[in-house]
């Protein structure tokens, strides 16, 4: 029997996906199989629980949604790989800090496959290349189970990041995989990063699914 279901969902609207995550987490029990949801979102700013309104400088035509994850404001859009981690931390005897570290290290290993030297920072969660942020993290834990997750910039229009202070840091530089790896695609990065996450989180029986 699978101990992890990996869903490739394509492009999904943010609100419906967030509601689905909350519902999944509220209704799961100790026998529920963990899931990873891999997708892209249409253009949207999301403001985390620690977010301040002044960090949203000029949203313009992009909607802003107040959400229940940790962290501050970030941007999602086509060409960015989003992976939501619906993990029973109690079952895995995993603390939140250990989960964050496992995610960051999986991203670092994934990028290294393409010759990109990346690293986390102790003062600002996420993964960075030469000081520029390439991946953001924001999690919520409820009843010992995680939801929300990571966003890796792959091959996207980066302009909307200039409309905010990403993660609450004024002037933070952002970058993406395609800056360093020609031809980078969300599909390829999804395949590589899921493999590293599975290894880092210790799942052994993985079931791949297309769609819900």
UniProtKB/Swiss-Prot annotation:
<feature type="domain" description="BPL/LPL catalytic">
    <location>
        <begin position="30"/>
        <end position="205"/>
    </location>
</feature>
<dbReference type="InterPro" id="IPR020605">
    <property type="entry name" value="Octanoyltransferase_CS"/>
</dbReference>
<feature type="binding site">
    <location>
        <begin position="149"/>
        <end position="151"/>
    </location>
    <ligand>
        <name>substrate</name>
    </ligand>
</feature>
<comment type="pathway">
    <text>Protein modification; protein lipoylation via endogenous pathway; protein N(6)-(lipoyl)lysine from octanoyl-[acyl-carrier-protein]: step 1/2.</text>
</comment>
<dbReference type="InterPro" id="IPR004143">
    <property type="entry name" value="BPL_LPL_catalytic"/>
</dbReference>
<feature type="active site" description="Acyl-thioester intermediate">
    <location>
        <position position="167"/>
    </location>
</feature>
<dbReference type="GO" id="GO:0005737">
    <property type="term" value="C:cytoplasm"/>
</dbReference>
<keyword id="KW-0808">Transferase</keyword>
<comment type="similarity">
    <text>Belongs to the LipB family.</text>
</comment>
<dbReference type="GO" id="GO:0033819">
    <property type="term" value="F:lipoyl(octanoyl) transferase activity"/>
</dbReference>
<feature type="site" description="Lowers pKa of active site Cys">
    <location>
        <position position="133"/>
    </location>
</feature>
<dbReference type="Pfam" id="PF21948">
    <property type="entry name" value="LplA-B_cat"/>
</dbReference>
<keyword id="KW-0963">Cytoplasm</keyword>
<dbReference type="InterPro" id="IPR000544">
    <property type="entry name" value="Octanoyltransferase"/>
</dbReference>
<feature type="binding site">
    <location>
        <begin position="136"/>
        <end position="138"/>
    </location>
    <ligand>
        <name>substrate</name>
    </ligand>
</feature>
<feature type="binding site">
    <location>
        <begin position="69"/>
        <end position="76"/>
    </location>
    <ligand>
        <name>substrate</name>
    </ligand>
</feature>
<comment type="function">
    <text>Catalyzes the transfer of endogenously produced octanoic acid from octanoyl-acyl-carrier-protein onto the lipoyl domains of lipoate-dependent enzymes. Lipoyl-ACP can also act as a substrate although octanoyl-ACP is likely to be the physiological substrate.</text>
</comment>
<protein>
    <recommendedName>
        <fullName>Octanoyltransferase</fullName>
        <ecNumber>2.3.1.181</ecNumber>
    </recommendedName>
</protein>
<dbReference type="GO" id="GO:0036211">
    <property type="term" value="P:protein modification process"/>
</dbReference>
<keyword id="KW-0012">Acyltransferase</keyword>
<dbReference type="InterPro" id="IPR045864">
    <property type="entry name" value="aa-tRNA-synth_II/BPL/LPL"/>
</dbReference>
């Amino acid at each position: 029997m699978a101990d992890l279901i990996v869903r490739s969902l394509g492009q999904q609207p943010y609100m419906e996906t967030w509601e689905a995550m909350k519902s999944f987490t509220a209704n799961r029990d100790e026998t529920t199989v963990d899931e990873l949801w891999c997708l892209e979102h249409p253009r949207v700013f999301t403001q985390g629980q620690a977010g301040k309104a002044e960090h949203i400088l000029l949203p313009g035509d992009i909607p802003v949604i107040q959400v229940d994850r940790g962290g501050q404001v970030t941007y999602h859009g086509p060409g960015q790989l989003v992976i939501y981690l619906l993990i029973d931390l109690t079952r895995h005897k995993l603390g939140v800090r250990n989960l964050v570290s496992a995610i960051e290290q999986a991203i670092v290993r994934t990028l290294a496959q393409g010759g990109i030297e990346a690293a986390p920072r102790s003062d600002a969660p996420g993964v960075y290349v030469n000081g520029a942020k390439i991946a953001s993290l924001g999690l919520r834990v409820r009843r010992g189970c995680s939801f929300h997750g990571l966003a890796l910039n792959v091959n996207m229009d980066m302009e909307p990041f200039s409309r905010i202070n990403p993660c609450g840091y004024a002037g933070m530089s952002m970058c993406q995989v395609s800056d360093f790896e020609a031809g980078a695609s969300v599909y390829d990065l999804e395949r590589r990063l899921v493999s590293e996450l599975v290894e880092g989180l210790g799942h052994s029986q993985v079931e791949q699914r297309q769609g819900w």
